[in-house]
Amino acid sequence: MTKVLVEPDPEEVKQLSEALGRQPVILAGICEAEYRGRAESVAGPALRIAMCKPDGTFILHNAMEKREPTNWNPAPSRQSIEVRDGCVVLRSRRLDVPEEVVVYFHKVLLACSLPKEGAKSEDSVFSLFRSEEDMKRVIREDPSVIEPGFRPVGEEVECGAGVADVVGYDEEGRFVVLELKRTRAGVSAASQLRRYVEAFREERGEEVRGILVAPSVTDRCRRLLEKYGLEWKKLEPVPLRDDGGKKQCTLTEFLAGEGD
């Protein structure tokens, strides 16, 4: 069951104790944190987000700064919530070594428990290209994902404007240049493809097609492609099971992309 509390009082937050260990629980607000274990540390008041996973994993992030967590405890750990002197105290204690993180929330802005249905990794499918090398592999193994009859003949091919990701021929024998983007493509991708096409056209003295291959493109990018006589091929990621057996994208990589 999902429960979302906006600017709750401490006693309301304490009710989420029942969900700890069974559902994902998230608290966000102004807090201080203490770590006690092999060393000791204190984090002063700041806006932070605390995440408690059912497997016992605990993570505390500063909401406005760097990607590394302020504190964290791996599983097996046990979390608890209590109210002390009007303050919400979230405690994470490791079960295998004597270490704990104690977070003192002076003001909780948001508290929620998430449904556990469909939350298991074996039920999820991770569908993001981890790199442009993944895209090349997909095209190499099945060139028809670009279009029927496409025949790739080279990767990382140099031209006067740089290095083209993939080149090949269509079923009519025309030379084709592919520019690959694993995330949403912007105008810079369209401009780069145009430069490659013009360079190959000048070097080869023949008609050259240019295709931007990406999961999606911005509106400005689409208009620029049309202006230059270039094409866009939507290539969906190959689903990868999030089973821990493959290297996953970081959040930074996931969010990276061209938004122009």
Curated annotation (Swiss-Prot):
It comes from Methanopyrus kandleri (strain AV19 / DSM 6324 / JCM 9639 / NBRC 100938). Pfam families: NucS_C, NucS_N. Cleaves both 3' and 5' ssDNA extremities of branched DNA structures. One of its GO terms (molecular function) is single-stranded DNA endodeoxyribonuclease activity. CDD domains: NucS-like. It comes from the Archaea. This is Endonuclease NucS. InterPro entries: Endonuclease_NucS, NucS_C, NucS_N, NucS_N_sf, tRNA_endonuc-like_dom_sf. It is found in: Cytoplasm. One of its GO terms (cellular component) is cytoplasm. It is an enzyme of class 3 (hydrolase). Belongs to the NucS endonuclease family. Its EC number is 3.1.-.-. Keywords: Cytoplasm, DNA-binding, Endonuclease, Hydrolase, Nuclease.
